[in-house]
């Protein structure tokens, strides 16, 4: 999976969205000799937006930050204490709109060979955890329902349960997009 992403991401034409605001997230892939895992966070319950949601570390692009990689690495260091030098950037995934369509989010796939001790920023991050990629590849682990929100256009919302956490929404769409770029493809169509 890692080699296929390393080769494919820099060469492929990715979808770029123009929106009034931009954000970036780091999609950390842990490859430390054990099973491949994706690193995620659960946001604290008292945040003004996306409280309690499972998410990748990330945030808004700051003025003067013209590179989504810089934003994703900065946010990962701020939110979970992941030093940028521990991340090998594999490439950029397609941009995704937020539900309100006002923000374009650029996911940055990054490889972590040796996971350091992580320290969550407790004001934003309630928990840091990892999901084995092999589990994410199993179609029977995913559920979905029709998105009935405004502007959904028949889109489905996908859900993945893991150790009491629910991966869904934008984060689930990013995971499924990442998996679609691997030789095995996405477990959900």
Task: Label the predicted regions.
Residues 137-158:
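A short, charged helix-loop
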Residues 1-56, 60-116, 125, 134, ...:
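N-terminal leader/linker segments that precede catalytic domains of diphosphate-processing enzymes
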Residues 101, 118-122, 140-142:
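A short secondary-structure junction signal
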Residues 128-129:
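Conserved cytochrome P450 K-helix/beta-meander segment immediately N-terminal to the heme-binding cysteine loop
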């Amino acid at each position: 999976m890692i080699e296929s992403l390393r080769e494919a991401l820099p060469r492929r034409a990715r979808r770029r969205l123009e929106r009034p605001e931009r954000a970036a997230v780091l999609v950390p892939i842990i490859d430390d000799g054990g099973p491949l895992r994706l690193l995620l966070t659960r946001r604290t319950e008292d945040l003004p937006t996306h409280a309690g949601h499972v998410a990748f570390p990330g945030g808004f692009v700051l003025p003067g930050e013209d590179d989504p990689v810089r934003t994703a690495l900065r946010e990962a260091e701020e939110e979970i204490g992941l030093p940028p030098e521990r991340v090998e950037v594999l490439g950029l995934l397609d941009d995704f709109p937020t539900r309100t369509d006002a923000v374009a989010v650029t996911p940055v796939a990054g490889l972590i060979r040796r996971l350091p001790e992580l320290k969550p920023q407790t004001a934003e991050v309630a928990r840091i955890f990892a999901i084995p990629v092999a589990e994410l590849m199993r179609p029977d682990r995913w559920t979905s329902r029709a998105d009935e929100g405004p502007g959904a256009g028949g889109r489905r919302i996908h859900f993945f349960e893991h150790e009491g956490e629910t991966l869904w929404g934008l984060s689930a769409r990013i995971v499924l997009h990442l998996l679609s770029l691997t030789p095995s493809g996405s477990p959900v169509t």
